[in-house]
Amino acid sequence: TFEPDFVMLAQNEGFRLMTLVTRSTSQEHIDREFAWAKSQREDSPETVSFATTISMENWDDPDWQEVTISRLRQDFDSGASAVKVWKDIGMTFRDSDGSFIMIDNPRFDPILEYIASQHKPVIGHLGEPRNCWLPVDSMTVPGDSSYFANHPEYHMYLHPEYPSYDDQINARDNMLAKHPDLIFVGAHLGSLEWDIGELAQRLDRFPNMAVDIAARISHLQIQDRDTVREFIINYQDRLLYGTDAGVSESTESVEWIAERWHRDWLYFTTDSVLTSPEVRGPFEGLGLPVSVLRRIYYQNAQAWLGM
């Protein structure tokens, strides 16, 4: 966030924030974002945490792994509490032979082993919602239709030569199978937002995996209400509330954030019939127990992200 009013709003509403250094294009870009994230943490240490990321620059260099681990060591010493990996791994970067670099590539193994040894979590936005591989008019929620209409570079239906949805999920699963000690938080319901049964299978298979629900609550709202409620109660220690939102002059307003928090709260806490601009038609709130709300809104962020 570039807006101090956002931090003040979070403090007033009892929220904590995590700033995610995102995009692995160059170390220069990462350094710029890292410095800003660190300054936010220093300004509001009780409210703001931050995650670093890894640079894919010089991927083919023999010492890339060593340099990357050294940089992560510095970042952890400087206060980073997690590592973010973004969808550009698997959807943008290519190896010297032209193949896409997936997260289960063996060159990542020593880096992931180092992160696990430091007991730091990886926050992984790997792949996209399954809607990404569908035509815009076949997508299940308006938010996806709007996003991919405006970001054709990430609309995989238009790029059949890119890795498939299953390729993305399988690469993530392979990575987790290779690194069972790695603490992993799958961003956006782990890109399994379309079917909580599929997500439950992964949570059962990978005990060190949790997911945040940021920017994917609408996908819960279009699934069977009782099934979703049972899923959240059963996996209450593996789900983290989040919004995937930031405030600057060019993004959402503080008022928009406050409205989003309120709308989400009604969905999780009441059994009222609700509407949302992100869902076509009405849906019923979940009316979750207070003990479950305490976990997904607070305790799990402490346990999984050290917030």
What is the role of each PLM region?
Residues T1, L17-L20, V48-T53, V83-V85, ...:
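Hydrophobic faces of well-ordered beta-strands that scaffold small-molecule active sites
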Residues F2-D5, T25-S26, E57-W59, G90-T92, ...:
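Active-site environment of divalent metal-dependent phosphoester hydrolases
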Residues E28-D31, P62, E66, M102, ...:
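Conserved phosphate-coordination/catalytic loops
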Residues T1-E46, E66-V67:
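An N-terminally biased module of ancient metal coordination in phosphate/nucleic-acid-related enzymes
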Residues R32-H155, P207-A210, I217, R225:
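Active-site gating/metal-coordination segments in enzymes
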Residues Q11-R16, D77, Y298-Q302, G306:
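Sec-exported extracytoplasmic/periplasmic mature domains
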Residues M156-P160, S164-M307:
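H/E-rich (His + Asp/Glu) clusters that bind or coordinate divalent metals
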Residues L9-A10, Q40, D75, I115, ...:
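Generic structural signal for hydrophobic
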